[in-house]
């Protein structure tokens, strides 16, 4: 289970924790931060497993390589600073309702070194806004062959695969063979 750090706001303030920094969670944390956090009426914390927000309807542009992500992503920490809420980086891995705690996974650098340990975050009010995921509607072959576009990581993975397939096709002698470079969009 590992060691845990307990993150507790000032005891006299109501602590509202919003898990999920998608469009809904980010909007809620921003609104609550402006109305309550900036005025010292409540402590607002946004939790997300990513450090930045990218508007989900733009993921297809990342996948196609037609958008500069750096120009469109929003740093949660900066948004929190501007709008009166705190940001905690980490993935929700557990919930202790009896003690009013969300359990956040440890976070790591790319090479595996720990950034933050597993920790518990105390709340008075909890909002789970973890969003949605793509539905394959039982379409044959989708689970085995498709890359869903639910996250920036998935969109970037698709873009790399597409570019690599194009490079491979361009480098061969002769024309592209049927089935060598197929792209199908579902949805």
Predicted regions and their residues:
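FAD-binding core/adjacent interface of flavoenzyme oxidoreductases
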Residues: 1, 6-8, 85-184
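Beta1-alpha1 glycine-rich phosphate/pyrophosphate-binding loop at the start
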Residues: 6-89, 93-94, 184-185
């Amino acid at each position: 289970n590992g060691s845990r750090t307990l993150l507790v706001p000032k005891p006299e303030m109501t602590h509202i924790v919003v898990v999920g920094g998608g469009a809904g969670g980010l909007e809620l944390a921003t609104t609550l931060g402006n109305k309550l956090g900036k005025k010292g009426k409540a402590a607002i914390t946004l939790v997300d497993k990513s450090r930045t927000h990218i508007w989900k309807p733009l993921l297809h542009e990342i996948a196609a390589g037609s958008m500069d992500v750096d120009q469109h992503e929003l740093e949660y920490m900066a948004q929190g600073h501007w709008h009166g809420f705190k940001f905690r980086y980490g993935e929700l891995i557990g919930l202790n309702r009896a003690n009013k705690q969300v359990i956040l996974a440890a976070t790591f650098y790319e090479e595996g070194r720990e950034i933050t340990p597993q920790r518990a975050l105390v709340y008075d009010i909890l909002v789970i806004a973890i969003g949605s995921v793509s539905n394959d509607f039982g379409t044959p072959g989708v689970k085995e062959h498709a890359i869903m576009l639910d996250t920036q990581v998935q969109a970037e993975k698709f873009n790399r695969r597409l570019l690599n397939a194009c490079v491979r096709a361009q480098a061969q002698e002769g024309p592209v063979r049927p089935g060598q470079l197929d792209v199908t969009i579902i949805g």
